[in-house]
């Protein structure tokens, strides 16, 4: 494991526990390499706080120190702007009696020890999908550009300089697996509300959803170190009062109990008591799990996603065969009708036009996604035969 990976874990632990890092660790840090790693996992702000506690910037090059501090300040500024904008959006929802619920990071960011410590890429809100058209009019009227209104499970809205909202019509879709899709199909039955409009999960149900969402990424393209930090912070803040019997039964029902337990225990070991050599105490399984998190970045990698899909196609646990690679390539070039259900509903409804979609995707890939396709092809080639 690289030294910067050990250092970022230690520094995050120091930031979370308000502990001053050891001078020997600070003196050995490559701030440029650490910055690249922190950015890859959307952890620059919390890592910067750890570095500031150790006075790491006192002797650092001016431009390097400036880069770190700007990253932290921008993360805080974005949350301030997004919070203010979110209040405008939710005030509108309340005025129109549109039921909604803040999701994921919107809840997590407020239980971290310091404001701005958890960086945010976007704000996620579940809403009553019957109000989609009304919300679309409101958001575009505020200067947002939107997409995804007929695909997937959320509508994405963007506005300069930093505004990014995902308004969810559902928490999971068919593409995320039948178990998760079915469990959350009637999510309104699990919601609590004081005014009948602004909703929330119980602490237990939020944790179950948070774990399910993390596992969705973990089991597909992967999820990064920030997920482990979320596990630690949430359990530190809420864990003692949660009904563990209920949690266990629901997590087992979803098939993610082992994932939750292993991630929770690993997170606690990494961050509860900051130690520079904490990784030396990990078991072989814990080390492998941590390496997967570290290798995934915030939102996973193409390599993880491709490898998982080819393993599913192979089906027998043996090394990936040439036949499997060919099947994978064909599935990417010529996706079937079921895949279109969430991604291109028109072609799901009218499959006779599928060839037009195939041609469009191929040309779009060649023009706009060459780098992505090259990475995917490289992963397919590297798979063991």
Ranges and model annotations:
Residues 1-121, 127-385:
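Conserved NTP-donor binding/palm subdomain of two-metal-ion nucleotidyltransferases/polymerases, i.e.
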